[in-house]
C-alpha cells in the first residue's frame, strides 16, 4: 500500500479478523469502540492510510503495506 492507497475502516476490521461481517464492524464502530490514531471513530467508511493506528477491543493494529 503506497501513500495514495486507502482501505475503509470496516474493511480493515474484517481483514484483520476483528469481526467476521460488515454488520459486526458497523456495530463495533457505531458503538464508539474503535479508535483511529487515538480518536474515537464512528464512520465505518473512514479511509485509512498506511501508518494509521487502530485500537479496538484491547488490541492495537497498524495499517501496513500489503504483501
Predicted regions and their residues:
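A detector for short, charged/polar N-terminal pre-domain segments
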Residues: 1-5, 63
Amino acid at each position: 500500500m503506497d501513500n495514495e492507497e486507502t482501505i475503509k475502516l470496516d474493511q480493515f476490521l474484517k481483514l484483520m479478523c476483528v469481526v467476521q461481517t460488515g454488520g459486526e464492524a458497523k456495530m463495533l464502530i457505531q458503538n464508539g469502540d474503535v479508535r483511529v490514531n487515538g480518536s474515537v471513530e464512528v464512520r465505518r467508511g473512514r479511509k485509512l492510510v498506511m501508518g494509521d493506528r487502530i485500537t479496538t477491543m484491547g488490541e492495537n493494529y497498524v495499517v501496513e503495506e500489503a504483501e
